[in-house]
Amino acid sequence: MLPPFDEFGYLPPGIHACGVQELIVRFGNGSPEREVETQELIDFFAWARNAGIQRVIVNGSYVTAKTAPNDVDIVVLPGADYPRGEPTCDQQEARWPFLQVFVAADEADLEEWSLRDFGTDRNRRAKGVVEVLL
C-alpha cells in the first residue's frame, strides 16, 4: 500500500511498490489531465509486459498531490529478451505524448535514476517514486 503524502504533497523518500490497479486508484482521477495520463499509462504498462520490461519506476507530478500534473516521468529496466518482437520504447515515443520514458542500462542505473535523479524536486527536497509491479 502506498504511503500518504507529506506536507509538500510528495510521497516519502524511497521507492514505493504497488500494482497497476493501486496506482490507478490513487493517482488516476481528479482532473482531465490525470485521466488522460492514466489512459496512456495503462497502454504503456500493457506494452511493457509484452516487451519484456523487468521494472518500471513512475515519477513526476503524476505521483504527487498536484491536481493537474504536466506529465509522467518513467524509467524502465528492460529484461534480457526485450523487446520480444514489440517496437522498442524509442519507436513508441509518439504513442504516449504525456509520458517521458528513460531506459536504464542496468539495475544500478535504475537505482540511480530512482533515488538520485527522480528522488528530489527542483528545490532538492527529497521525495518518493513508485515502482509499478507488472
Language-model regions: role of each:
Residues 1-55, 59, 63-69, 78-134:
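Catalytic core of pol beta-like nucleotidyltransferases
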